[in-house]
Regions:
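Basic/polar, cationic surfaces and motifs that engage anionic cell-wall
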Residues: 2-13, 19-24, 98-189, 231, ...
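Soluble non-cytosolic domains of exported or imported proteins
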Residues: 26, 102-110, 195-199, 209-212
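Cell-envelope and extracellular/periplasmic
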Residues: 36, 73, 85-100, 117-121, ...
């Protein structure tokens, strides 16, 4: 089994009793979550300290960008409604808005990038991958230098990590991998598209992303409140 360590980015520690003891699988996944509230690391620590809550995460990022640790990386947290995932994933609860799309503040997202870089580096990984689909991600066997992103919504009827973060999972993977490789600028596959006559969000997603149902990612990425778009409007398109 791996030699485990914990992140030096954590400035607050309150270890939760809610965990399964040492992992049965080496770390090769990271699972970001949304808290559904602009909570502090102390609030998360208090929540996870209660045995009746039956929940915990390895780390949490408070609304101010501070990092808390609640379950050491060597141990499996109770976070993603799935034993197999949490045995191999470092789980991170992130302060968010209390309603859809559960947006993160800049301080939280930027710290998430930094924390993912640290987790990957300490666990010998040079690439963070977002494979997009549940089937592909859960059936993928990572190379020894690879870490895979997973999400709570694959294991429970939840939005988690929220539409805001879900639309940015590819960006997160690219930014982390770029920092791990020492690149000055993170590689991004995000592009733009100018709306034409007859377009709809569904049609654009089907044509550019290969799946019309991914229109929600375009909607979230552009901060659209409705499905209405206008000819000439420039839309940001997420990575394919």
């Amino acid at each position: 089994m791996s030699n485990y360590s914990n992140s030096s980015l954590a400035s607050y520690t309150k270890l939760s009793p809610n965990h399964s003891g040492q992992r049965t699988h080496a770390i090769d996944r990271i699972t970001p979550h949304c808290v559904v509230g602009q909570a502090s690391v102390e609030t998360l620590g208090n929540i996870f300290s209660k045995t009746a809550k039956q929940a915990s995460s390895n780390y949490g990022i408070g609304a101010d960008g501070r990092v808390g640790m609640y379950v050491e990386e060597k141990n499996r947290s109770w976070c993603s409604s799935n034993n197999a995932n949490d045995q191999r994933a470092v789980t991170i609860e992130c302060a968010s808005d209390a309603s859809e799309p559960y947006a993160f503040r800049d301080a939280v997202y930027n710290k998430l990038v930094e924390l993912c870089v640290d987790i990957c580096r300490r666990n010998g990984k040079t690439k963070l991958l977002w494979l997009r689909t549940k089937t592909k991600s859960l059936n993928y066997s990572p190379a020894s230098n690879e870490m895979v992103l997973t999400v709570h919504r694959w294991f429970a009827r939840k939005s988690c990590p929220g539409s805001w973060m879900y639309a940015r999972m590819g960006e997160l993977a690219n930014q982390v991998t770029a920092k791990l490789s020492g690149s000055a600028e993170p590689k991004t596959e995000q592009t733009t598209y100018t709306v034409k006559t007859g377009d709809s969000l569904w049609k654009i997603a089907a044509r550019l992303l290969g799946n019309g149902s991914r229109y929600t990612e375009i909607k979230t990425l552009n901060g659209l409140k409705t499905n209405t778009i206008r000819v000439g409007q420039v839309l940001k398109i997420p990575a394919k």
